[in-house]
A protein has these predicted regions:
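Active-site-adjacent loop/helix surface patches within enzyme catalytic domains
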Residues: 2-118, 133
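Acidic, glycine-anchored loop motifs typical of Ca2+
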Residues: 129-136
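Secreted/luminal cysteine- and crosslink-motif detector
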Residues: 145-147, 166
Length: 166
């Protein structure tokens, strides 16, 4: 993998309360033709972190730029929380308080370990179809991770560490 400078947050697109493990996702990804789980970390409903794909191997979690050298898979950490759909199967922020706390802690740790310049939701990597300079909700390829990552995880680029944005 190239130098890590981004974190991409995903959801498993499973209904609230349906727990999965990293091994479950690994099996699902292999069934889709992957050679292993695409995410580097999985955050279960109870807030437990499970490791997925090694950070020494290119990810397989965000292919919006294709297989080019600029692909997020080449320079980002993929974090997936279990959930993302409500009881009716509609996109929703279903993170438990434990998942939220664990995600904030993991992002903070990754920002300290790597020179992270951006923390994005998978949907934020969709193409800017209207050329406005901002990917708007109407341009999202998918709703994943079903919450606004940019507002929750603002970064000070001079000192990469998550902070609250008002």
């Amino acid at each position: 993998m190239n130098k890590i400078d981004s974190i991409i947050i995903h959801c498993s697109a499973t209904r609230a309360g349906q727990d999965l493990t990293a091994k479950d996702i690994d099996r699902m990804h292999r069934a889709r033709g992957f050679n292993q789980i695409g995410y580097n970390y999985v955050i279960r409903i109870d807030g437990t972190i499970e490791k997925g794909r090694s950070l020494t191997v290119d990810g397989a979690h965000c292919n919006t730029k294709g297989f080019s050298e600029s692909s997020y898979n080449k320079h980002s950490v993929g974090v997936c929380y279990i959930g993302g759909l409500d009881a009716n199967g509609k996109p929703a922020d279903t993170r438990t308080p434990s998942q939220k706390a664990t995600l904030r802690q993991l992002v903070a740790e990754l920002c300290k370990e790597y020179d992270i310049i951006e923390v994005l939701g998978h949907r934020d990597t969709s193409p800017d179809l209207d050329g406005s300079g901002e990917v708007e909700p109407k341009e999202y390829i998918k709703a994943c991770p079903c919450f606004d990552v940019r507002s929750e995880f603002c970064l000070l680029y001079t000192s990469p560490s998550p902070r609250d944005c008002s």
